[in-house]
Curated annotation (Swiss-Prot):
Function: Required for developmental progression after cells of opposite mating types fuse with one another, essential for processes common to both dikaryotic filament formation and monokaryotic fruiting. A direct target for transcription factors Sxi1-alpha and Sxi2-a.
Keywords of this entry: Glycoprotein
UniProt-recorded name of the protein: Clampless protein 1
Annotated organism of origin: Cryptococcus neoformans var. neoformans serotype D (strain JEC21 / ATCC MYA-565)
Glycoprotein in keyword set: yes
Length: 472
């Protein structure tokens, strides 16, 4: 191996002696490169007067640059970021285009099936008592004709037209109802006249007046006191859980009920049937059969619902003593004659009582148990559309009870029957609409001759509403 002497090195220390070192070939080459590079003097770095990108680094060899890293300017970083963003977007687009469309979710099918099962569940009706056969519900209620009220059975009012009396009473009826309902019965207070039978009268009084808390109420109630005590009960043969006794002003009933004089007449017909009639042996169910007839129903057809029938009975008249007059004793108790009022549906008598004392108030909300402002068909449908058939049948039973009471009392005001018919059409229409929706029938498929009933219009309106909800 050859041995070289180290060449002279130019440095700042020129006066220092160069040592004699024996070098190998590799060491000599490495030392030569280092000494050659060390002799290169870089020019002075100029100061930048203003902001800028600066000067790019100067390279001679990757390992021997004047800076230990590659300079990355702001423009370079911006370009690099733009390229990366573009590549990410292109990859996402390719990935999105290559993805397959998602299959139909089974959850949607389950939702449709659960909705169908829920509709079937709501369409079930469980009557409180077994009903033999099928229950036929008419699309409209029959409207029987009632006799006109010719006079008021009162010695001071016989010569005055009934309509005139009623028109003068209409503004006073709400206050009469408030006062009469404030009277409470006191069964332990005897009648001041010992000759009066005990069970023929009943003592009433306003508790706040009797105990002295509000004695001024007695002056306000003067002229509007009740004159009759009604024991509201089921008709004979239908059972009863107890009668409801309420004090009333008989004039409010006498001016609006065609059959009211039957309760106060001195001669009461007692039927003696020749043979049992089919109506007498029929068993009453939760929803008795109602035969749908034309509107011009005769009085004879209605007489079958009363407690006697002139065609099949021998009527015997017996004279009964006239009802005792109302008397107020010295303690402030009002002794009223007690009269039993047998009606088909005592549970719906409060609706009748309120309607007779508030004739200008809408009856439709009371019939369906809705707030007072629900007076149109659209509002009623909004309220009852979500009810089940079980709940709708309960409302239908209430409506039928009101219908029976109207027929029994002889209330024939046209406005009353129109509102009852509208309530009946709304409830029956929703029940029929549920059947149409379950069966999948379309309105165009139904062939019909003649005019639609109100219940049919409600049924198809309900179906259209439900289909619109399903599409949302």
């Amino acid at each position: 191996m050859a041995t070289y002497l180290a060449p002279p090195v130019s440095s700042n220390k020129e006066n220092s002696p160069a040592p004699n070192i024996a070098l190998s070939d590799i060491d000599a080459i490495s030392l030569s490169l280092r000494t050659s590079l060390s002799g290169v003097t870089l020019p002075a770095k100029k100061k930048v007067a203003a902001l800028g990108l600066g000067r790019a680094p100067k390279f001679t060899y990757r390992r021997h640059s004047n800076k230990p890293y590659n300079r990355s300017t702001s423009i370079t970083r911006a370009k690099k970021a733009a390229v990366q963003t573009k590549s990410v977007r292109s990859k996402a687009a390719v990935k999105k285009s290559n993805t397959r469309p998602l299959p139909l979710k089974l959850v949607q099918r389950l939702d449709v099936e659960s909705a169908r099962l829920e509709r079937l569940r709501k369409a079930v009706w469980n009557p409180p008592a077994p009903v033999p056969g099928q229950v036929r519900v008419p699309l409209k209620l029959p409207y029987p004709r009632f006799p006109s009220i010719e006079y008021i059975d009162n010695e001071y009012l016989k010569e005055i037209p009934v309509q005139y009396i009623f028109d003068r009473m209409v503004p006073l009826l709400p206050s009469i109802a408030t006062i009469t309902l404030a009277y409470q019965p006191y069964a332990s207070i005897p009648h001041p006249d010992s000759k009066i039978l005990r069970d023929t009268t009943l003592a009433f009084a306003i508790p706040e007046v009797i105990d002295g808390r509000k004695p001024h109420w007695a002056a306000k109630a003067r002229g509007r006191e009740p004159d009759l005590a009604l024991a509201v009960a089921y008709k004979s043969g239908e059972g009863s859980n107890g009668n409801t006794v309420v004090a009333v002003n008989s004039l409010a009933f006498a001016t609006q009920c065609a059959y009211w004089p039957r309760l106060l007449t001195t001669s009461i017909p007692i039927p003696t049937p020749k043979r049992p009639t089919p109506s007498a042996s029929a068993v009453s169910t939760s929803l008795p059969a109602i035969v749908e007839t034309e509107e011009n129903v005769s009085d004879a057809s209605f007489s079958s619902s009363s407690s006697w029938s002139d065609s099949d009975s021998e009527v015997e008249f017996i004279d009964l003593p006239r009802l005792p007059r109302p008397v107020k004793d010295d303690k402030g108790f009002l002794h009223l004659p007690l009269v039993e009022l047998p009606i088909p549906s005592p549970s719906t008598f409060p609706i009748i009582h309120r309607h007779l004392h508030h004739p200008s108030r809408a009856l439709l909300p009371d019939l369906l148990g809705l707030p007072e402002h629900y007076t149109t068909r659209s509002q009623v449908l909004d309220a009852i559309s979500g009810l089940s058939v079980q709940q709708l049948m309960d409302k239908l039973t209430t409506l039928q009870g009101v219908w029976q009471n109207l027929c029994s009392l002889g209330i024939g005001r046209l406005g009353t029957w129109r509102q009852l018919g509208e309530a009946w059409a709304c409830v029956v229409g929703v029940i029929a609409g549920q059947g149409l929706l379950i069966a999948g029938q379309e309105e165009a498929e139904v062939q019909r001759t003649g005019r639609k009933t109100a219940a049919e219009d409600v049924a198809w309106e309900w179906v259209r509403r439900e289909k619109a909800k399903e599409q949302q």
